[in-house]
Amino acid sequence: MFDKARESDDLGWLELIGADLVEAEARREAIDAGRVSCTRPFDSWLRASGLWREHARRTGRRESLDRAAKCASEATRHTTTPDQTAAAAIESGEIHLLRFDLFGGPATLTAALADAQSLTAERPVTRAAAAALHARLCARRARLSGLPASLLDAAALLDAALHGAKVLPPVAADELRLDRAGLALEAGVARRDPRLLDQAGRDLRALVESASPDYRPLTRARALALAGAGLMALADLAGSDAARMQGRELFEAAADQFTPDHSPLDWIAVRLAEPGGDTPLLLLAEAEALGREPGLILGALARERRLAAEAVLAESTGDVEALTGLEAVIRRRLSAGTRTEPLDWAADQIGMAHLAMARGRLTGTEPRAVGLMLAEAIETAREWGAPALMRRAVLATPEVGA
């Protein structure tokens, strides 16, 4: 069934198979690429890299990302033309971009941007791919800065890249559309601009309509989740309960597109995109288990959300003992002597703050060092390029005099 698709540059067909099968495809392609009898080693190594990269995107596994990097390096060794050299460099840049998306680390982004700016390509499709990579990297940097002007400049680059994306595989063009909509959404929220939010909504509706649930379930789910976030932002600006309800319906529709094992990280992202308090504790615990790779941004966010929900539940039932027990679990984890990834540490600090404040309200005592915990979590999340985790710490910070 997939024989023809396997030879295509468009990896959109992978959306139809689960993460385990993607891993099997990546292993098969890497083995074939390494055979002496392989007639097109460059193409095979590049395809193997793309497959491992897709597996990493679905599961958050560092090992898969490292395998993708090794395959891209092998592809570089087998280049025979300047255009192939550029294509291998673009694949390496895509791996750097995904590593940043999964684990943070702005230094990775800076290095990838420097490489992308120096690319020279001959074929129109390679030039378009280079422009798309550069635009997407700039979009990540703009989102880190949070400055409206930077967001709008990055949006212009994405527009230009999309204009030249007609020669790219559909999945690459869809990535650009999702990034442009996400950027418009973020700029709209930052500027409290309903026009930008509406623009993002139109782009996402078009993407949802073109992404069939029978062929592109993951792209459809990503667009639905972003559209839900946009409606929630509009609801907050306009005070509209109807828009808020529509946003919740879109989140549920996104979650219904696939099962958690099909794409664990997409499932986590959809669940965490829902407004705080709407996601049941059981689902948050499942999200945390699926995102257990050390240092994974989504895993850290899931852990913090689960701890926040545990604190709310224990406080609502007046269970001081449960709060104390949860704090003890975190302390044991932090003092175990094993290396803790910075973002996991930050999530635990925010969780400890939630628990300490809940216990303080129940016992009438002043929680100690909460401000310091949250300040250090904010700084760590900022340094590692995880603005979503930083926002969670800011939201948890008690108002002075409250």
Residue ranges and their predicted role:
Residues 1-24, 345-402:
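C-terminal non-catalytic interaction modules
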Residues 1-198, 211-218, 396-402:
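Flexible inter-repeat linkers and adjacent short helices
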Residues 40, 44-47, 84, 91, ...:
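Structural signature of alpha-solenoid helical repeat junctions
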Residues 49, 56-59, 93, 98-103, ...:
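Short coil/turn linking the two alpha-helices of tandem helical-hairpin repeats
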Residues 66, 103, 110, 152, ...:
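Residue register within tetratricopeptide repeats
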Residues 69-77, 113-121, 155-166, 201-213, ...:
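Amphipathic alpha-helical segments of tetratricopeptide repeats
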Residues 104, 125-126, 166-174, 192, ...:
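Acidic, Ser/Thr-rich low-complexity linear motifs
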Residues 250-360, 373:
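Eukaryotic tandem repeat interaction scaffolds
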